[in-house]
Structures are given as structure tokens and as C-alpha cells.
Amino acid sequence: MKSKIEEPSANGGEAIRFELAHLLGQLLDHRWMIVAVSVLFTLMGTLYSLFATPIYSADAMVQVEQKNANTVLNDISQMMPNAQPASAAEIEIITSRMVLGKTVADLGLDVLVQQDHFPLIGAGLSRIIGQKAQQIAVSRLKVPTLWDKRELSVEVDGPDSYTVSKDGNELFKGKVGQFEQHGDVTMLVNSIEADAGTRFTVSKLNNLQAIKMISNNLVVADMGKDTGVLGLTYSGEDPVQISRVLDQVINNYLYQNIARKSEEAEKSIQFLAQQLPDVRAKLDQAEDKLNVFRRKHDSVDMSLEAKSALDSSVSIQTQLNALTFREAEVSQLFKKDHPTYRALLEKRQTLDEQQKQLNGKISQMPQTQQEIVRLTRDVQAGQEIYMQLLNRQQELNISKASTVGDVRIIDHAETAAKPVAPKSILIVAGSLILGLVVSVGLVLMKALFHHGIDNPEQLEELGLNVYASVPLSEWQRKKDQETLLKRKLDARTDPHNRLLALGNPTDLSIEAIRSLRTSLHFAMMDAQNNILMITGASPGIGKTFVCANLATLVAKTGEKVLFIDGDMRRGYTHELLGAESKTGLSDILSGKLPFNTDLVQRGDYGFDFIARGQVPPNPSELLMNSRMKELVHWASQNYDLVLIDTPPILAVTDASIIGKLAGTSLMVARFETNTVKEVEISYKRFIQNGIDIKGIILNAVVRKSANNYGYGYDYYDYSYQQGEKS
């Protein structure tokens, strides 16, 4: 019981080790592909690092002073799990449209100028060969908003002249420093530092695009928790421009902070600026009335009682006017239910009551004294108010000018001498690693999902005998490539240049077919006849190659061999042997030509050959004709071995018809091309038709590290080395 439990575990471990070894072998087999892909990726990474535009980085530092108020509450809030650092709000302000938008307006960043280069590599190539950078400065640009692409092409004509065009159509010619306006297009070029003929693309960005361009290249980070110090980094292609942009950003941030602090004073100054002209006008009017009254009444003098009432009334009126201006300021900060606002209203009410009492006393004086008191009071009160407003205006101006914000610039923008990107070493190393990952991944994916036969044991597991494993012949592969290059074969090709058994008889593939010849000698002893059918599951697996070379090797032993090309659809054996195909099997079976030995071709290949003939419309019906049986019977009587090359069984039924006439049948499967499932289905189809498949020939075997085991492979190596020594 114990052994039964342990046995699967052992087998499972062995299977895992086999799979790992198999995958490792796949990597070794495809090592040159892995190397090639890795080198390709590395080369691409190297080229990218050479041609990529260098990116520079400027950095600056600002300090935001911490507020001392509510220290305990601030400390408690910072202890909350979702608490944001105090600098988070300042970071948002720096990257806001308020700050960045003013930067765009100050520096004219909504106008983008780019030199035209050859796509992809032009800019990098110019930089590598040391070509001087070409540039023009455009400070003003206005184009119609309805344009799909709000850009113009500018070509330099000379040191101070240029030509502007749109979509290849010239719009106007301009001069440096001159404001050019033509139709809806307005442009001002400040300077040109470029050779004649240099082209530039000048684009007009909307405000949001320009702000986003800055925001994408701007990084603001807290330099430490609760330090209040912020580090700003801005990256771009122009090292001078990025310093200017970053400096302008921090200056605008500083200005908005100061403006926020002095906002109350600014509003008060604006209010006073509106009130002073009215107060001055009322004062002038009051002085004019007093002077007119005195001239009319010959400079009337006031009594002591009138002077006392006048002084009190002026004082009260001055306080009321001051409260009026104070109320105007307070109303912008507080509501009427605020204690400060209520206190102001209560004080006004008290002064109003005092003024009423005083007016009652004045009303008891003579009419002339009343009038002189009233007029004099208006003048003196107006003078007091006017002087108070002037003094207040000066105080507010001084307060505004001396306002210091919470922000302090610690370090102004500085650009590093060396570019921060691209990082050549990292790019090349990353490209190499990526190439390795991609190539290894492709190899492993192919190994996991490709189910082609790569081991004779896979066929033996189906119960089929593997009669031979024929190695892939490099000689034959080169000849096939030459054939593909020529596209059309010469019908009279020398078989020594195409047939492996004649052209290179010491090839390892021929040694394997010799072994097959020996195996067939004993396998066919008990067969009903000497007819050998060789078929396969699919086309392009090397059936004809095996048949032709086997026929040659058997003929060399002195036996009389007949090779019949039974593939009347796509048979090409006549091309391989340099024979004729005008007449052949199809003509015999269709009765177009009476059968005689003249139809049998003979050549330097050593065996007799019947070509496929003209391609018929009904090959299967012809094979079922009695003439086929008569031909096979005649061939069996007159030859020691008859080989019939047939079409693939999974494509057509010809092989199942011919197999009924053959005493021995073999299938050919191609290494890593045919799958086990294809062979299994083909084998079952033959069994259903009552045809016994004697065995399998595994063709085009390539020795691989993934399958570096088995007697067959060692045998080929051994034979090859012995051949070299002998």
C-alpha cells in the first residue's frame, strides 16, 4: 500500500524534473535566437539613448513659514490618520492655474517654437554631429481660433527677414522687430539666430494647454515633514528656458502670497480713493457757502456760547463721519450681528443722541448765530474728515508696501550642467533585460503551446513502431532553398544535384535511410506482396524525399525497384529526378495510353520510375479502376520492390485506396511539424479502412538539447565521428 502511494509522487517529481530539463533544453536550442533578439533590443536601446533629446532639470527651494496660532489644535489635526501636511495646500497653490497662468502670460509660453527636423532621427543626428542649435524668438502670435491646427511655418530668409506660410501657402514676409499683421494673423519676431533656409513650426497654444505643458514638467515636493520647505523641479529641453520658467513660477507664488496678505489694505485703499474726491468736493462746497454768508453779513462774530457749541458739534460730526468710513470697512469683513459691528452701531447711536441735544441748544440761538455755527461746523468737520482720510490713505499705502508674506525664496532656480535624461546606461541595460525576457518568453511560450512531435517515444506511446529517425540534412535544406529562389525547377535537373543519396551519400540522413532499408528487408518477408506504400498525415513532411532516397539505396543493393508517384494532384518526384511528367500514372489509369514498358522511365538514379502524368479531375476514381490493380500486379511480378508515394491521408482518400493493394504500409511524420493527434487520427483512419500501418518514419529530426537523450541520437553522432576517423 505504501509503495502505491509513493509511486505517483516519485513519478510526479520525475515528470517535473523532465519538464524543467526540457524547458532548459529549449532555451539552449534557441540560444542564438535569444542572443539575436537581445542584441537587437540592446541596439535599439543604444540608438534611442543616442538620438533621444536630452532633458535638463532646474530646481529651486522655498520656505512656507508656519502659523503659530492654534498650535495645539494643529498638532492634534496632524495626528489624525488622514491628515494632510500643512504644505499640501501650498503645493496645490503653486500648481494652480492662478500661478501657472500668470507665468504663461509673463513669459509668453503660449507661443511654442520648434525647429523642423527629419522625423525621429533628425534632431538627434544634428546634435551628434555638433550642428549649432537654430532658434528664433517669437513674443507675439495671434491666429484664428477656427483653425484646426493653430500653427504656422516660418522659414528664415536672412538675419532679419523671414517668410510665414500655412499648409504650404505663403501668407506674408516679415522683418525682425516689426509688428506684422496680415488678415487674422498677427506676429512679432524679436530675434533670429538661424541660417537662411531653416524652417520652424510656430504654434499658438490656448491658455489651458500652456498651463498643462508647465504642470506636466513641474514637480513640487515637501522636503520633510512639517519643515515647511518645498522643493520645486522643472524639466525641459532648453536649460536656460527652464530656469526662467521656474524662477517666474516661484516669484508669482511669492507675489500672490504677499497680495493675499495685503488684500485688506488694498481694498481699503480702493475705498478711500473713491471717497476722497467726494469729501473734497463737499468741503469746497461748504467753504464757498461760509464765505458767501460772511460777505453778506459783514463777517459776523460768534459768541462764546456759539463757539463752544461749534466745537462740540464739529467733534461729534467728525466722529460720526469716521464711524461711517469705519463701517464701510467693517461691513466687508463682518456681519451686523458680529460684536465689532454691534459696538460700532452702538457708538453711532450715542453720537447721534449727543448731536440731537447739541442741535437743540443751537436752535435756541439767534438765527444769524445758528447759520454761522452750522456753516462753520460743516467746513471744520469737512476739513477734519478730509485730513483723516488722507492720513489713513498714507498709512495703508505704507502698510501695503511693507507687507511680508509667509513665503521666502531660499534657492532660486539653477539648472544642472548634465541632462537628467535619457539615462543611457539604464536604458541600454533595461533594453538588454527586456530583450532577454521577450526572447526567453517567446521560446517558453512556443515550448508550452507547440505540440509537434519532438521525440520518438511520443509515437511509441501510440503503439506504433518507429522504423527510423531521419536527421535533417543540411545539404538537402540548402538545395531546397536554391530551388525556392529559382522558383521554377528545370525539368531536366541533374538528380545528383537534388537527390541526397546520389549527391551526398555519406550524409547522416542517408545512413538513417540505410537503417530503414535493413528494417524493411525483414519486415516485408511476411507481407502478401512486395508493394510498399509510403504516406503521411499532411503535405510537406518529406514523403517524396524518403521514397526517392529509399528507392535509390535499395536499387544499389542490386534489386530491381519501381517507384510510382501516386500523388496525381501535387506529385513532384519527376522534378526531383529530372524526369518527364507529360505521361504517367494518370494517363495509364484513365486509358488514354495503353500500358507498356515505354511509360517506365529510367535514369541515373538507378531505379525505374512512373511519373504522376497529367493532373486529372478525378484521381480517387482512377485509383479505384481495375487498371490500377493490373498495374500493381504487373509491377509486383516484374520488380523486387515497388514503392508508391501517396498523398496525405488527412487531405484525400487516395492513400486508403492504394493501401488496400500494398502489402506493407509506412507513415512519415515530420519532426516538430506533425502533432501526435494528427498521427493518431491518420492511423485510426487507416485501421477503419482495414489497412495495417507497419510503422512510422520520423523525418527531419534535429538534435536539440531539449531532447538530448535516446539511442537514436547517440547512434547518429557515433556514426558521424567514425566516418570522420575512417
From Swiss-Prot:
Its EC number is 2.7.10.-. Keywords: ATP-binding, Cell inner membrane, Cell membrane, Exopolysaccharide synthesis, Kinase, Membrane, Nucleotide-binding, Transferase, Transmembrane, Transmembrane helix, Tyrosine-protein kinase, Virulence. InterPro entries: AAA_dom, Bact_polysacc_biosynth/exp, GNVR, LPS_length_determ_N_term, P-loop_NTPase, Wzc-like_C. Pathway: Glycan metabolism; exopolysaccharide biosynthesis. Its main location: membrane. One of its GO terms (biological process) is polysaccharide biosynthetic process. One of its GO terms (cellular component) is plasma membrane. It is an enzyme of class 2 (transferase). It is a multi-pass membrane protein. It comes from the Bacteria. It holds the Pfam family Wzz. It is found in: Cell inner membrane. Coiled coil: none annotated. It catalyses: L-tyrosyl-[protein] + ATP = O-phospho-L-tyrosyl-[protein] + ADP + H(+). GO terms for molecular function: ATP binding; protein tyrosine kinase activity. Involved in the biosynthesis of amylovoran which functions as a virulence factor. Belongs to the etk/wzc family. This is Putative tyrosine-protein kinase AmsA.
